[in-house]
Amino acid sequence: MAPSSLGQLILGYQLIWDKSRRPAAMQLFMSPLQDEPAEVAHFLRALQQTWSGQSPTLILTPLSADLLMGALEHNTPDGPWLCVQQDLLGEAGMIDLMRRAHGRGVQLLWRGDPGERPDAAMAPLFGRIIISLTPGEALAGAHMSLTHNRDTPSATNPVLPGQIVEAVPSRLMADHCLDQSAAWGIAGWPSDDVLLSHKYQPVQPSHQAIVKLLREIDKDVALDLLEHTLAEEPLLAYRFLRLTNSAAMGLRKEVESLRHGLMLLGLSRFKQWLMEQMPQATDEPDMEPVRTGIVMRAHLMEYLLDAGDEDTLRREVFLTGMLSQIDGLLGEPLRDALHRLPLSERVNGAILGRSGPYAPFLELASALEYPHMTNVAGLCETHELHLDDVNRTMLRVMAQLQH
């Protein structure tokens, strides 16, 4: 992708989760870097080259009238879905462009403020709508979830089948939307509330992840694949690092990476340890988006700091991103969690002090998560990074996500 398009845009992402708590879509927000118009047509062509059939559905959400008009004019039926902001509908010529895009087969979505819904006359143009609930609507939905039979329809339900619900405040409301109201998806995930529900019952590793690792060991897969699978379960990875650095293991060297630990421990002892984790492991669907979000940030860091062929550096950068949110899974202060591991000053400095060589990339990976994208341009300038490189990297990581 050329700097002519990616260097003109500030991008941020938000995952949309389906009933199985898997990514149904990737919502990509875009704002202009400056007042001058961006080359939207080129950006759309480049997006289609990056996105694959294995990637989640892409929902493009322009946050300015010029970007939205450009997307409506140039998008194709096989391009990304286009999300239209309610507050941009009043722009001159916008409705006409929407009708023409709809006529070409472009999938349009509507998005508004809490409590808003699309005008009845405009509703036929939209394949789906993204709603935000008012506090009263969220309370009504939570009350229904607690008191009503899920098979009993209610005219007071603020969520209709097929809708996408944004900024859901609680785990209870997320379950109501996806499991009881047949919402198409949840935009963003109430991770803080899900973790808060574990205040008196610690989070446990994923049973599914442990089973997958055991199968891979039995199949004698490559060590790289084992390392990748272990890294996809942050809590299990943290416990593994604790294990390999414990006095009970008697290993002669400090273990600073998952791969190093696997090599020193050996697959037989690793398998035995996994079996010991099985009784406490759980399959808790609401935790999957939390884990995925942590791993996404880690992968963004890994790719933002282009380590080239330096695998050791790449692993340390990934570990930095993963451990930056481990406190939520452990239910304890981040400093306490990190001090139990023999981490380098580069890792500790980035996470605890926002200092050192990895800190800029941790800050950027966090800022790319909507709604923090307004900080991206300033961070690029502060740390002398190119915005087009940052955007290109983010899109590459997003496209690799499996739905």
Positions of predicted regions on the chain:
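Bacterial c-di-GMP phosphodiesterase EAL domain
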Residues: M1-W81, Q86-R100, P289, A307
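Residue-level detector of functional hotspots within protein domains
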Residues: A2, G7-Q14, L44-A46, D66-G70, ...
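Conserved alpha-helical "signature site"
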Residues: S55, A142-H403
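Generic structural signal for short, solvent-exposed loop/turn connectors between secondary structure elements
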Residues: S31-F43, D113-P118, I131-L139, K219-D220, ...
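Short, solvent-exposed coil/turn linker segments
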Residues: L15, L63, M69, T76, ...
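The catalytic core of metal-dependent phosphodiesterases that act on cyclic dinucleotides
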Residues: H74-D192, L313-E316
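Generic structural hydrophobic/aromatic packing signal, biased to beta-strands
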Residues: L11, L28, L60, L82, ...
